[in-house]
A protein has these predicted regions:
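Acyl activation and transfer enzymes in specialized metabolism, enriched
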Residues: 41-66
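A generic secondary-structure boundary signal that marks alpha-helix termini
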Residues: 65-69, 127
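Flexible, P/S/T/G-rich "lid" or insertion loops adjacent to the active sites of thioester-utilizing
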Residues: 1-46
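A broad, low-specificity signal marking well-ordered, structured residues that form hydrophobic/aromatic
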Residues: 32, 88-90, 139
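Histidine-dependent nucleotide/RNA phosphoesterase domain, centered on the 2H-phosphoesterase fold
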Residues: 59, 71, 130-133
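Residues at beta-strand starts and edge strands
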Residues: 28-30, 50, 54, 86
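Helical lid/core segments from catalytic subdomains that handle acyl or acyl-like groups
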Residues: 94-140
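Small-residue-rich loop/turn and linker elements
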Residues: 70-104
């Protein structure tokens, strides 16, 4: 996976002063719960022989990646950056032992490509009970 981003100059960025105020003076937490009708996604997944879970992960990832505001982070030297894209982290639950694996699959704009990557990652880490994949800074 190629990790590519653009470095942000806080002094030149139009939102730089506001960003500094929030980061320096406020505790920032975001949580969101909404009801969403997934009927069309279920039908699409069935018609295209896709599993629902990776389809759901993909569609949320697609929306997140259309908003630059969700792609800001810090690089390893502490610079503010904006990722070109971010990849989802998700949990794969193991019924047999009630454990889980936390996985990351590289995002693709194409649902079919993402679904293939998802299944490869799932199979590759089937026996793992850990956090697997990319470092936490380029994912959500």
């Amino acid at each position: 996976m190629e990790m590519s981003y653009t470095k942000i100059d806080l002094n030149e960025w139009s939102r730089g002063k506001l960003f500094k105020s929030y980061i320096e003076n406020m505790r920032i937490v975001m949580s969101l719960t909404v009801e969403i009708d997934v009927t069309n996604l279920i039908e699409f997944s069935k018609r295209n022989n896709l599993k629902f879970y990776p389809s759901m992960i993909w569609i949320v990832s697609k929306v997140v990646n259309t908003h630059d505001e969700f792609k800001y982070s810090w690089n390893d030297t502490g610079d503010l950056i904006k990722w070109n894209f971010i990849s989802p982290s998700y949990t794969e639950f193991h019924k047999e032992d009630e454990n889980f694996t936390k996985l990351v699959t590289e995002f693709s704009d194409d649902i079919f490509e993402f679904s293939k990557r998802f299944m490869v990652d799932k199979e590759k880490h089937e026996a793992d009970r850990a956090f697997c994949g990319k470092p936490a800074f380029e994912l959500f």
